[in-house]
């Protein structure tokens, strides 16, 4: 019921999902684009619910404050510190490699503003983790 409702809302809002994840793949990266609004977070949740995928997403630690931190954690949010010397792709790759089964959503533009040039972090994470 949740999948059907999420799918109905997702498609009613004009979004589409391209491709399917083979059931034998335990770890993978999902690209969410374009990321031009804070509403994209809501669309991402709908996508994961529609596909029956346990939600995990990375979000800058600045968003982790009370009471939002409780909501974000319950939704699968993982805070990242972008000021650390270790770059973000390494932090995400390390997290990814610590889990046997994991799907993560990455928005490759690197900003909510329109940006036709994608950053390459998702590619480097895929290479470091050998995840499709």
Give the location of each predicted region.
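Soluble catalytic domains of membrane acyltransferases
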Residues: 10-132
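Helix-enriched interaction subdomains in cytosolic or periplasmic regions
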Residues: 1-3
């Amino acid at each position: 019921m949740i999948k059907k409702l999420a799918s109905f809302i997702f498609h009613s809002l004009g979004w589409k999902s391209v491709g399917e994840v083979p059931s034998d793949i335990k770890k993978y990266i999902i690209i969410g684009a374009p990321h031009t609004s804070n509403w994209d977070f809501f669309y991402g949740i709908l996508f994961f619910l529609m596909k029956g995928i346990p939600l995990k997403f990375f979000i800058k630690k600045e968003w982790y404050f009370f009471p939002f931190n409780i909501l974000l954690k319950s939704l699968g949010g993982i805070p990242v510190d972008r000021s650390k010397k270790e770059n973000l792709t390494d932090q995400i790759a390390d997290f990814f490699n610590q889990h046997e089964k994991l799907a993560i959503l990455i928005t490759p533009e690197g900003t909510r503003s329109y940006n036709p040039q994608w950053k390459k972090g998702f590619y480097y994470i895929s290479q470091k983790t050998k995840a499709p």
